[in-house]
A protein has these predicted regions:
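Signal-transmission coiled-coils
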Residues: 1-177, 188, 192-196
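A short beta-strand-to-loop micro-motif at the C-terminal edge of the catalytic HATPase_c
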Residues: 280-292, 314-320, 328
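Glycine-rich acidic phosphate-binding loop
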Residues: 240-245, 259, 329
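Short adenine-binding "F-helix/F-box" segment of the Bergerat
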Residues: 248-255, 266-267
């Protein structure tokens, strides 16, 4: 993606569109098959059936699209892609609701994890490809499609710190300060989109843990420290909080979908109105409330592994938690990942 570049005659757009025309129906067909292979009781869930119908309609529209022979047809294809992106924007929420409604009927946690890991990462890949093609029509400084050629980890962290602090202040009346250290001047080519999901999830978790472990002193809470480390192979973002750590009995469950320390009666849905409006303020549409749905951390973990990296949780019970997000560079110097 990074080295495809742009051609003056627009042939790069036709080439990209033709690739998507062949590739996207195949990927969507795999997702339809995986839904149909779910245990019968889950496949009958109305919310999951809604996702199934969305994928079937997308497959039909994409597979019936005519060959892309000129820029006019490519423009029509772009409009279809944008329509499908809009139609599918709530798929993660629907999956979360559908599995929460039906998971009690399935004893094997591995079935749920394997399905959601594959479905969510496949969805990320398809959205990245489609959004990249649409972005190739734009002329933004330091961008080739969705790839930022000079991404600053510090700046993207600061953006999501501001977002997470506003959420936290709304819920708790205050929010921890965040200090950023390490290789703060680092810049390199990378795709902001997955970071725009992962970082707010990790920051919200750290802020919630900090505030809830200091309920007696909500206006005197320890800082969260974010450290950036950059090298030739990858870059690491460590988020360290003093929120008391994760209890031993929960540590092996934090990567399970729907695991949450919040009681079910108080669980908040991702489309919560007030918090949803805050999400809209930063044009996200991807991030959910401070807690209670149990999807953020396992999804972030799946995304990081899909991108050739890792997400590791280190808990010091009684002190706090360190989370290490490690992602491979995409500059072509070392082995990276395939979208």
């Amino acid at each position: 993606m990074l080295y495809a570049g742009k051609s003056p005659d627009g042939s790069h757009l036709l080439k990209s569109a033709r690739y998507l025309l062949k590739e996207l129906p195949v990927r969507i067909a795999h997702r339809i098959k995986s839904i149909r292979n779910l245990p019968f009781i889950m496949g009958c869930n109305p919310t999951l059936l809604q996702v199934h119908e969305l994928y079937i309609r997308a497959f039909q529209k994409l597979s019936e699209f005519p060959p892309i022979k000129n820029s006019e047809v490519e423009g029509q294809y772009c409009r279809l892609l944008q329509q499908l992106l809009d139609d599918h924007k709530d798929v993660v929420t629907l999956l979360a609701e559908g599995f929460r409604e039906s998971r009690r009927h399935v004893k094997d946690e591995a079935v749920i994890r394997q399905f959601l890991d594959k479905t969510l990462t496949s969805r990320l890949g398809m959205r990245m490809l489609a959004t990249h093609h649409l972005a190739l029509h734009e002329d933004r400084p330091d961008f080739v499609g969705i790839i930022c050629t000079r991404l600053s980890p510090k700046k993207i962290i600061e953006k999501w710190v501001d977002f997470a602090r506003r959420l936290c202040e709304h819920k708790y009346g205050n929010a921890p300060r965040v200090r950023i250290s390490g290789h703060v001047a680092a810049r390199f080519p990378y795709i902001p989109m997955p970071l725009d999901y992962i970082l707010p999830e990790l920051l919200k978790n750290a802020m919630r843990a900090t505030m809830e472990s200091h309920l007696d002193t909500p206006y005197n809470v320890p800082d969260i420290v974010v450290t950036i480390a950059n090298n030739d192979v990858d870059f690491i973002i460590r988020i360290s909080d003093r929120g008391g750590g994760i209890p031993h009995k929960h540590l092996d469950k934090v990567m399970d979908y729907h695991f949450t320390t919040v009681e079910s009666s108080t669980q908040e849905l991702p489309n919560n109105t007030i918090l949803g409006n805050m999400v809209d303020m930063v044009n996200s549409g991807q991030s959910n409330p401070m807690h209670g749905f149990g999807f953020g951390l396992p999804t972030s973990h799946a995304y990081s592994e899909y991108l050739g990296g890792s997400l590791v949780v280190q808990s010091l019970q009684g002190i706090g938690t360190d989370i290490y997000l490690r992602l491979r560079h995409i500059d072509g110097k070392e082995e990276s990942f395939r979208i």
